[in-house]
């Protein structure tokens, strides 16, 4: 198990749906979330998929590297997630 930070930007129009989809995906791949922060709605620097604003969510979690790869692939397919970034924490 490794520790990761995961940040997502979701569509404003699907705020609750996107958040539940993220949580379901993490649970499905046995990702253990240790901390969760809702950074709120923010204006994007440039439009992403024709969206001017997005909802930012930040998670600290631990998981198997293979599980994180699967989560990232599912996030790419999900239409409610505009962007996501996973960073491995060392230490």
From Swiss-Prot:
Membrane spanning residue stretches: none
GO terms under cellular component: ribonucleoprotein complex; ribosome
InterPro entries assigned to the protein according to its UniProt record, in alphabetical order: Ribosomal_bS6, Ribosomal_bS6_sf, Ribosomal_S6_plastid/chlpt, Transl_elong_EF1B/ribsomal_bS6
NCBIfam families: S6
Annotated gene: rpsF
Record keywords, A-Z: Ribonucleoprotein, Ribosomal protein, RNA-binding, rRNA-binding
Identification of the protein by name: Small ribosomal subunit protein bS6
Record bears the keyword Ribonucleoprotein: yes
Physiological role: Binds together with bS18 to 16S ribosomal RNA.
Pfam families reported for this sequence: Ribosomal_S6
């Amino acid at each position: 198990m490794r520790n990761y930070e995961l940040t997502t930007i979701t569509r404003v129009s699907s705020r609750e749906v996107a958040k539940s989809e993220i949580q379901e995906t993490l649970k499905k791949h046995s990702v253990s979330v240790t901390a969760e922060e809702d950074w709120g709605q923010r204006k994007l620097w440039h439009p992403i998929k024709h969206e001017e604003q997005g909802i930012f969510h930040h998670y600290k979690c631990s998981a198997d590297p293979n599980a994180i790869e699967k989560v990232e692939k599912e996030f790419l397919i999900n239409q409610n997630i505009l962007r996501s970034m996973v960073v491995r924490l060392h230490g």
